[in-house]
Amino acid sequence: MAYVLVLNSGSSSVKFQLVDPESSATDTPLVSGLVEQVGEPQGAVTVKTGGEEFKEELEIPTHSFGLDRAFSIMHEHGVGPTDVEVIAVGHRVVHGGRLFSEPQLIVDQIESMIEDLIPLAPLHNPANLDGIRVARKLLPEIPHVAVFDTAFFNHMPPAAALYAINNDVASQYDIRRYGFHGTSHEFVSQQVPKLLDRDPGHVHQITLHLGNGASAAAIRNGRPIDTSMGLTPLAGLAMGTRSGDIDPGIIFHLSREAGMSIDEIDNLLNKRSGVKGIAGVNDFRVLRERINNEDQDAWLAYNIYIHQLRRFIGAYMIALGRVDAITFTAGVGENDTEVRQDSLYNLDMYGIDFDKEANLVRSKEPRMISTADSQVKVFVVPTNEELAIAQKSAGIAAMAREAGLY
């Protein structure tokens, strides 16, 4: 059996999975794991395989050291990159800018182009690039593929993609709506026509990726026409720690009146806002407990979250003209029954006949939570970004081999 090693490299961590690209979305990967606290005195490498977990706590000075140690632990249990057939290494890259609309076989030139995009994603692309460079050195004989979070949204209509600011400034500094969570939105949106038993080219849908980060997308006939995140993942819905859309004048006000620096405002809006900024927590399970205990801040945070979500659902229903399906995915979207119910409350006049009993069913399988005769079908579809990356990477790797590059 052939596998793809999927890597998601952060500034102080590396998540990894060995995935069969032919598997289904609910199948367990052969290996999953995490290298954490890179550069800190107390790091750890965790490897899960065959229903068992193996964890080693140690200092991890670099990404290279941590990933090499992870491969060694995998090898000790017969599932290392040299023990099984690995046909590709797929790398999640957050920002592809205008340069990348499709996955790319990684060569030195592609590395340089990803580096050129660092100003658009200063927190994410450097870490993604570190992971690419480390993995290419450790596994030089295997094709490496970059899969970009922004790629799915790269051809949105100009009216949705561009901001109403000076053209010259926007062009000079690459300012536009790029969108994020693209791999997830694309993956989920491809499952919906199968559930509807419809041609993908004739489905209008809204996808809602609701995790700690959250985004919405309007997709017409397989192509996105709008999305909630923008130049950065800060825009759009209220999220776990991010503000989502705000009046840009708030930034000037905080600078002038509070004397806050750009970095301080950046930290406030990205890490100390959203649900956490209002309620003090961003775990929706804890938030629900506090709401049940009549915590007013928790109730306010939840209401703002739902209000923003309903605003985008309504806007995208208008943008699409006809909506065949609304789909919830990611941690909150897949597991929080009340978020799903409250976000679609009292929308029967718009063709949404919500099934409260179906909504309460717990399952890892895709499922419908509207009634059978609802004009707009509502689904819960578990996302699997790693599988999507594996599938895209396997395809690019196959073409590279056919071209004699490997």
Curated annotation (Swiss-Prot):
NCBIfam families: ackA. Mg(2+) binds at N8, E385. The gene is ackA. The active site is at D149 (proton donor/acceptor). Pathway: Metabolic intermediate biosynthesis; acetyl-CoA biosynthesis; acetyl-CoA from acetate: step 1/2. Its main location: cytoplasm. Belongs to the acetokinase family. It is an enzyme of class 2 (transferase). Homodimer. Mg(2+). Can also accept Mn(2+). It catalyses: acetate + ATP = acetyl phosphate + ADP. The record marks H181, R242 as: Transition state stabilizer. It comes from Corynebacterium aurimucosum (strain ATCC 700975 / DSM 44827 / CIP 107346 / CN-1) (Corynebacterium nigricans). One of its GO terms (cellular component) is cytoplasm. Its EC number is 2.7.2.1. The lineage of its organism: Bacteria, Bacillati, Actinomycetota, Actinomycetes, Mycobacteriales. Catalyzes the formation of acetyl phosphate from acetate and ATP. Can also catalyze the reverse reaction. Its cofactor is Mg(2+); Mn(2+). The keyword ATP-binding applies. This is Acetate kinase.
